């Protein structure tokens, strides 16, 4: 499974 980068700040 691909790890999705966390784009929340």
Curated annotation (Swiss-Prot):
Tissues expressed in: Expressed by the venom gland.
Modified residues (Pyrrolidone carboxylic acid (Glu)): 1
GO cellular component: a single term: extracellular region
Keywords: Pyrrolidone carboxylic acid, Secreted
Role summary: Peptide with unknown natural function. Protects against maximum seizures in a pentylenetetrazole (PTZ)-induced epileptic model. Acts in a dose-dependent manner when intracerebroventrically injected into mice and rats, but has no effect when intraperitoneally injected. Since it does not alter the spontaneous behaviors of the animals, neuropolybin could be considered for further research as a potential treatment for seizures.
Any coiled-coil regions, as ranges: none
Species this chain originates from: Polybia paulista (Neotropical social wasp)
Recorded superkingdom: Eukaryota
Miscellaneous notes: Neuropolybin refers to the sequence pEQWQPQLHR, it is synthesized based on the inspiration drawn from the peptide Ppnp7, which contains uncertain residues.
Protein name: Peptide Ppnp7
Location (main, coarse): secreted
Membrane-spanning intervals of the chain: none
Protein localization: Secreted
């Amino acid at each position: 499974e691909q790890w999705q980068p966390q784009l929340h700040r």
